[in-house]
Structure formats: C-alpha cells, structure tokens
Amino acid sequence: MKSGRFIGVMSGTSLDGVDVVLATIDEHRVAQLASLSWPIPVSLKQAVLDICQGQQLTLSQFGQLDTQLGRLFADAVNALLKEQNLQARDIVAIGCHGQTVWHEPTGVAPHTLQIGDNNQIVARTGITVVGDFRRRDIALGGQGAPLVPAFHHALLAHPTERRMVLNIGGIANLSLLIPGQPVGGYDTGPGNMLMDAWIWRQAGKPYDKDAEWARAGKVILPLLQNMLCDPYFSQPAPKSTGREYFNYGWLERHLRHFPGVDPRDVQATLAELTAVTISEQVLLSGGCERLMVCGGGSRNPLLMARLAALLPGTEVTTTDAVGISGDDMEALAFAWLAWRTLAGLPGNLPSVTGASQETVLGAIFPANP
C-alpha cells in the first residue's frame, strides 16, 4: 500500500486561489506538513467565469484554457516544493481536483467537467498525478459530488457526538457524521459565490473582507424570500450544484423585481441567504451537537455569527479548533483521495452521492521512472 508524502491541489468554485497542501498519508493517519495559496491571474479567472456562465468559446480557446490551468497548478506545486526544499522523488503523487467549469449530474447524459491538463502537471513537476476524480461516480449513477464527506468521516467522526462538517467555498456543502447512521452529505446551495460575484461587480473587490459591506447593509426580506423559493433548496438529497446554476445571472433575475436597492443591502441579503439555507438543511437533517466549518466562509464573521444564532444549542466552530486548517481542508482531501486511488481503495460514498456502488476514483497520470 502506497504511503508517504502526497500533495493535494484544489481550485474551487470561489476562484480565490489555488490551494496546495503537503501531507504524510498512510492507512493510520493524515498529517499535514505545509501549505500555500497560489494566485490565479485575473485573465484566467475571468475566462473560467465566462465559461461557467455559458459564454461560447472555440475549441482552441477551450484547449488553451485547459493547458494554462495545468501549467498554473504545476507552478503552484513547484513553489511548494521549493519552499520545503523537496524534490520530485520525495513525493508519491499529486491529487489534483482540477477547475470545475460545468457540473450537470442529472438529465439524459449526466456529466461533470474539471479542466487543468494533468499531463502538463506531470511534465512540469516530474510527479505522478491522480485526477479526474468525479466522473466515475457519475458513470455509476451518482452526483459525482460531494466527495469530501468520506474524508471528513475518516478524520472527524466521533463515536457518540452528532457532528456535521460544513465547507463554505463558492458552494456550501454539508457532511453528516451521525453515530449509527450512514455518512450523508450534499451541496446546500451558494456559499461565497453570489456574495463574491456581487461585490466584484459593484466595488471591484474579490470578496467582502470581514463582511464589512454586508454588515453595513440590511437584509431585504422580500428579496430573500424570493430567492428561497428556488426549487434547488427544497430538492431532496443526493444533490449537488455549482456556478453553472448559482451565478450572477441567477442573481440578476431575482434583482429585476427590486430596482434601485442599496448594493450593501443586497450584500447583506446574500449573506443571509447562505446562512439560512445552510441552517435549514442542518435542522432538516436532524441537527447536530457540533458544526465544524471550513473553507473561505469560515473567515466571514457575519456568516459565523448568523449560523450560531440560527442554530441554538449547536456548537458552531471552525475545523481549526480540531487541528485542521479550514483553508486547506479540500486540498488535503484530494491528497487523501489520491492515496486511496493508488492503494486501490474506493473514494466515494454511495450514501452521499447516490452512486450504485463504491468505486476507486480518478485516473492516474504516471511520471517517468
């Protein structure tokens, strides 16, 4: 069974940077050693946003974007190796999620698409890469997401305490770690995605630092109620979503009925939308004693305060409190999934994704001996 140093690479729907994590992994433990966040050039970020919102592009443009993202991921890995004074031979493999540009797990031909050419990563780092983690689960009738609940269960489940892990990235997803029950998990809806999109369009800022804009505004209740009527929120699990659904166009369609509103009030309303949709799903799933939050949203003081207020009797904390950096959780999970793939172990949970069976995930891109 492969064990040793693994690297996880994650570029999520928030597009706030490439997260790279170095960890030692074996069948008994996962020990994080180092991490860094690598910037995404504005031009690449905009290209990804455009494709996620349905903008047409040529096959040549698509191929170039795939290559450019692969090179970006390789640069991020090499930066971490240099920082840690490590060589390619010191790493067993890289687990690279890729950049999701479309996720449509239902319909006549369900599919999901993550780009960032793994061949570029192998060629530029000299390290074996495991990627394309989601499509095997979809081929077996699953949603292909979320995949991180299996990792949450391995690291954070408790024999007696009802726990849930909440990742607030661009999309928010919940892992249900309830003693005596199968692991559950699904996307609750927008996390930071709509908040980030709004402040970017209105103020040219990548995100609402410390929720300053949202805290300066007031929740527009009719707008909130209008958005809460979206059918996704009442759809039963298993379910997953992404930027191709909850994007700026989605927000604009709701704002048409509310002309002339204060932009800060919209920001406050979007923060409340995220908090309410998450808390409702926690309660619908039977509640928990401890909600451990990770992802960029765990740094949003307004979101954390609203979750605590909406979930009385639940201890709302970050995963940092149990020794796992909330910023690195997903990248660490894909390092772990790469280890499982190389070990021939399943990486999905049918109770989460709805797949017909457990399966080994991903494709292996071997480095030269």
Swiss-Prot record:
List the GO biological process terms: 1,6-anhydro-N-acetyl-beta-muramic acid catabolic process; amino sugar metabolic process; peptidoglycan turnover
Any one GO molecular-function label of the UniProt entry = kinase activity
In terms of Pfam families, this protein maps to: AnmK (PF03702)
Family affiliation: Belongs to the anhydro-N-acetylmuramic acid kinase family.
What is the recorded function of this protein according to its Swiss-Prot or TrEMBL entry?
Answer: Catalyzes the specific phosphorylation of 1,6-anhydro-N-acetylmuramic acid (anhMurNAc) with the simultaneous cleavage of the 1,6-anhydro ring, generating MurNAc-6-P. Is required for the utilization of anhMurNAc either imported from the medium or derived from its own cell wall murein, and thus plays a role in cell wall recycling.
Reactions catalysed, semicolon-separated, are:
1,6-anhydro-N-acetyl-beta-muramate + ATP + H2O = N-acetyl-D-muramate 6-phosphate + ADP + H(+)
UniProt pathway annotation: Amino-sugar metabolism; 1,6-anhydro-N-acetylmuramate degradation; Cell wall biogenesis; peptidoglycan recycling
- Give TM segment ranges: none
| InterPro entries the UniProt entry points to | Anhydro_N_Ac-Mur_kinase (IPR005338), ATPase_NBD (IPR043129)
What keywords is this UniProt entry annotated with? Answer: ATP-binding, Carbohydrate metabolism, Kinase, Nucleotide-binding, Transferase
UniProt organism field = Escherichia coli O6:H1 (strain CFT073 / ATCC 700928 / UPEC)
Official protein name in the record: Anhydro-N-acetylmuramic acid kinase
In which residues is ATP bound? 12-19
Q: Which Gene3D superfamilies match?
A: 3.30.420.40
By its UniProt entry, which HAMAP family does this protein fall under?
Answer: AnhMurNAc_kinase
- Which E.C. number(s) belong to this protein? 2.7.1.170
